[in-house]
UniProtKB/Swiss-Prot annotation:
UniProt keyword annotations, A-Z: Blood coagulation cascade activating toxin, Disulfide bond, Fibrinogenolytic toxin, Fibrinolytic toxin, Glycoprotein, Hemostasis impairing toxin, Hydrolase, Platelet aggregation activating toxin, Protease, Secreted, Serine protease, Toxin
Keyword ATP-binding: no
Regulation of its activity: Inhibited by diisopropylfluorophosphate (DFP), benzamidine, heparin and hirudin, but not by plasmatic thrombin inhibitors, antithrombin-III and ecotin.
EC number, UniProt record: 3.4.21.-
Summary of subunit composition and partner proteins: Heterodimer of an alpha and a beta chain. Subunit beta is constituted of two disulfide-linked polypeptidic chains, beta and beta'. Calcium appears to be required for structural cohesion of the molecule.
Protein name: Snake venom serine protease Afaacytin alpha/beta/beta' chains
Family note: Belongs to the peptidase S1 family. Snake venom subfamily.
UniProt note on tissues of expression: Expressed by the venom gland.
Organism: Cerastes cerastes (Horned desert viper)
Subcellular compartments: Secreted
Occurrences of domain Peptidase S1 (ranges): 1-27
GO BP annotations listed: proteolysis
Post-translational modification: Both chains alpha and beta are N-glycosylated.
GO cellular component: extracellular region
Length: 27
């Protein structure tokens, strides 16, 4: 479960970074 949680956190961080990058490029 812990390993899965770590993967989930890494995925979430990637999505956040991607979203932030998209917002920056959008502006």
């Amino acid at each position: 479960v812990i390993g899965g949680a770590e993967c989930n956190i890494n995925e979430h961080r990637s999505l956040v970074l991607l979203y932030x990058s998209s917002s920056x490029f959008g502006e």
